[in-house]
């Protein structure tokens, strides 16, 4: 289903986007895609820290773009001025059957000419940076989240450290309280940029068996060149 986001620079639009990302790591699917880049480039700057979920997503996509870029196609996302809520309520009018975007999810508002120009400039900069292939090593900090408070965190960490490949070295780790008795695993790793794609590592190892028995989601908290 295509997703339509509108005026994500307004307070109302950012709040809706924050609610939308509450249970999601990406705009669509289970890995970063062109949908994320479309929304990312529509934001002229990093969102305020009060938008916790948007900030988490924004920092994650920033890190991915600095590392290996975003290549997945996604499901299709638009940033436009037509407005409707993410979860339509009873008093909202149903879209006409012949409208092209009747299945779209719209986080409302309008985009100004200045915002469009800023988005275009940002898209050009991201596209240019994506073509640069950097060599060397990087230090990465991951947030690995369990399914619930009953998840065995020792086995979760074991599943993470069992991922072995050329150019990957696991480092220090700690458990950080999240709330409601749930803790997340923060773990450092050092990678050789030309050999390890963090996005692929998460998608291919953490979100597949047996690791996905313990891991609900994983986010990149920090990504720094060494």
UniProtKB/Swiss-Prot annotation:
The keyword Calcium does not apply. Gene3D superfamilies: 1.20.1050.130, 3.30.70.60. It holds the Pfam family EF1_GNE. This is Elongation factor 1-delta 2. EF-1 is composed of 4 subunits: alpha, beta (1B-alpha=beta'), delta (1B-beta), and gamma (1B-gamma). PROSITE patterns: EF1BD_1, EF1BD_2. InterPro entries: eEF-1beta-like_sf (IPR036219), EF1B_bsu/dsu (IPR049720), EF1B_bsu/dsu_GNE (IPR014038), Glutathione-S-Trfase_C_sf (IPR036282), Transl_elong_EF1B/ribsomal_bS6 (IPR014717), Transl_elong_EF1B_B/D_CS (IPR001326). Residues 82-131 are annotated as: Disordered. Residues 97-113 have a biased composition (Acidic residues). Belongs to the EF-1-beta/EF-1-delta family. GO terms for biological process: translational elongation. Keywords: Elongation factor, Protein biosynthesis. GO terms for cellular component: cytosol; eukaryotic translation elongation factor 1 complex. PANTHER family: EF-HAND AND COILED-COIL DOMAIN-CONTAINING FAMILY MEMBER, ELONGATION FACTOR 1-DELTA 2. Residues 114-124 have a biased composition (Basic and acidic residues). GO terms for molecular function: guanyl-nucleotide exchange factor activity; translation elongation factor activity. EF-1-beta and EF-1-beta' stimulate the exchange of GDP bound to EF-1-alpha to GTP.
